[in-house]
Design a protein with these regions (language model features):
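Extreme N-terminal starter segment of soluble prokaryotic enzymes
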Residues: 5-7
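Acetyl-CoA-dependent GNAT
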Residues: 10-16, 21-97, 102, 115-117, ...
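Loop/helix-junction capping segments adjacent to catalytic residues or to phosphate/diphosphate-binding pockets
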Residues: 17, 108, 139
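Conserved phosphate-binding and hydrolysis motifs of nucleotide-dependent enzymes
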Residues: 70, 109-111, 149
Length: 169
């Protein structure tokens, strides 16, 4: 499949079921290591989490047939990570999440386009800092975020291989 025919746009309420299906498949495929369970609260509440708040958004990548092959989301960071409590000025910090690309389409610039859209959105909504966490075991995840200008603030290591990263806008 060529990337030139793909459409990247903010999701709408009618996209929720297909985006949920895509995300749940990605989570099953990527978080299958023993003892790991992906957190899916936001997946089941996409509308409430990413569509209703004006300072949040989610984008999806669609094939011409309407199949979801990628996603990325921005929401206001809520100081939920215990190890980082108090680090961020909350009104000015956004959290990047749910950035996944179908395995057959990775390394073709789609993720970078999504990051560009998220960055533009964040600047328009007054965010000054982007926070995310990733895992060393995710294919291309950690290296991708470093190439996008994110810096490590905490590498937890351990079986979940969690790395916390940030980027100042």
């Amino acid at each position: 499949m060529t990337t030139q025919n793909l459409v990247i746009r903010p999701i709408r309420s009618e996209d929720i079921a297909s985006v949920q299906d895509f995300l749940l498949k990605q989570l099953r495929d990527l978080f299958h290591q023993e003892g790991q369970v992906a957190i899916t609260d936001d997946v089941w509440g996409l509308g409430k989490t990413y569509l209703e708040p004006e300072n949040c958004n989610m984008w999806a990548v669609f094939t011409p047939a309407g199949t979801v092959v990628g996603s990325a989301a921005i929401c206001a960071y809520n100081d939920r990570i215990e190890l980082l409590k108090g680090r961020y000025h909350l009104p000015a910090t956004a959290e990047v999440g749910r950035c996944y690309i179908d395995a057959g389409l990775r390394r073709q610039g789609i993720g970078s386009k999504l990051v560009g859209l998220m960055t533009d959105f964040c600047r328009q909504h007054g965010y000054k800092m982007l926070y995310l966490h990733t895992h060393h075991f995710l294919p291309g995840g950690f290296n991708f975020w470093q190439k996008q200008g994110f810096e490590i603030i905490l590498d937890q290591g351990g079986s979940f291989e969690i790395v916390h990263m940030e980027k100042r806008l």
